[in-house]
Amino acid sequence: MNDMKQIFPKNSHKFFTFHFSLITYHFSLITYLVCTLFSITASAQYTLKDWNIENIDENSTLHLNVSEYKLNYNHPLPYADWQKGWKVKADLRCGTLGTEQVFVCKEGKASHLIGRNSLAGDISIGYDNMHGQFFVEVIDKDEHPHRLCAGPRVEKGRWYTVEARAEYNTRKDASTVQLMVDGKSEELTYPGKALRHNCSLWIIGHGFPGGFPNALQVRDGDMRNLSISGESLPRIEGQNPLFTDVFTADPAFTVVGNTVYAYVGEDKAGIGGWFNMPHWLCYSSTDMIHWTSHGTVLSAADFPYAQPHGSWAGQVVQGADGKFYYYVTLDNKQNRQHTIDVAVSDSPTGPFLPARKDGTPLITDDMTPDSHRPNADIDPTVLIDDDGTPWMAWGNGDCYMVRLKKNMIELDGEVRKVPMRNYSEGPWLFKRGKRYYNVYASDAPGVQPEQMAYSYAESIQGPWTYGGFVSTSANHGFTIHPSVIKFKGKWYYIYHDGSYSQNGEPGGDCRRSVCAEYLSFNADGTIRFVSLTQEGLSQHK
């Protein structure tokens, strides 16, 4: 294998090096690992001795005794998609033998069952008790593990320099991992990129976070000079996320002629922070690949009664009068209840202004008193049927539906609850042929976080039939929100995902990015399951 300088050349694309430090920080009785980020070209070098923690001795050694240190995804560092290559290097010493031990591990998400996400160690480095050697284990793109052992038989109490590194071969769509222990190396090849894309957790001292029983703990061992680095692949046109300037969420796409308009909420939460969504943004495209930003088209503050940082999910539709109506979720700053209101514009790129002249919301919580969740009135979706009748669905915990007047800003009939299996929030109504579909965020029994499910009907007024899952939960985040469109003969499934960085800053639960996949149907009209990928629309251009 090439020298690491060739694998990760100077000034290469998006190269990051994580030099881990340790501080004593008690949160949920867990000590966290903190790291400092700098480019490979930086001259500073850090070891564990640079930070004052109890477990570091005068020789810069961290003693591991059933202890756990972890670096959460939401800590202040860019999340690196180390798909081109990565390297982990440390000096390790085993105080006991005979038991398998994991010294350092990168946990990742593996979806072995639809909607049920189990954890698997994307990279694990430790002691293999069957071979008596140090090992590296990686998980490939198909969720299969590959373990490689190298070096001499490990002796208790002796220090070893252990270095694992991997490099992706684009032409072969395969990666080679090399393990070197005290200068003796072995290597193996596994399918796919060097590292799967997912948000995750780096852990020292355990093979699984949280001290689970038999979690491959290091019961008596030492570590020093830990260094972790990696390199991402160049961005490909059409890959996720769609927008790379800011964090975006709650997608609502609308097709007008030969152009698709994407309406999204802007996530401005700080790293690890809670929701802060002051604006709705608009982008446009003629091919779903290249996008033009039109900036802010509406803000929560445009509604006098609304809390200014709650620009929640909504949808834009074009009325019979040619105007564009933006149905949005807001927080009433007086009673803190969610409401649904509507804004209007002569142009799909705004600006939008509140449409109801009396200044009252379109939907308030007193219209849905039978909801089993508080703040039921969120996430409006509007479908204009073939006869010109507009219908709106929404709801948190329960799905509600009402007919709108042709003026688009008043109700035309009673609000009614529509039974939907496993319904959570975020409905999206669309029609294909003679069949109506409602795709929504789902809380299947015993499954978290939210997945995406759907129901279908031959009439907008039902009865509705449960169709099953559309996708798993997002790669990171406890929410997911759908948008479905047909554009230039192709169907698209759009959602948000918190596992992507923007401008060198990490995503998260409240720092999401809008993504897209192709959507297809079976011959009977049911929706085919969608895999959420980083490749996105670049896969079938």
Would you name each region that the model predicts?
Residues 158-176:
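Localized edge beta-strand/strand-to-loop motifs within extracellular or lumenal beta-rich domains
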Residues 189-222:
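Flexible glycan-contacting loops in extracellular carbohydrate-active proteins
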Residues 232-541:
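Carbohydrate-active catalytic/glycan-binding domains of CAZyme proteins
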Residues 89-94, 213-233:
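Extracellular, beta-strand-rich glycan-interacting domains
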Residues 136-161:
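Short, aromatic/His-centered strand-loop micro-motif at the edge of beta-sheets
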Residues 64-86, 147-153:
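Short surface loop/edge beta-strand patches of beta-sandwich-type extracellular domains
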Residues 75-96, 102, 119-124, 226:
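A carbohydrate-recognition surface predominantly in extracellular/luminal proteins
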Residues 105-137:
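Glycan-recognition/cleft segments
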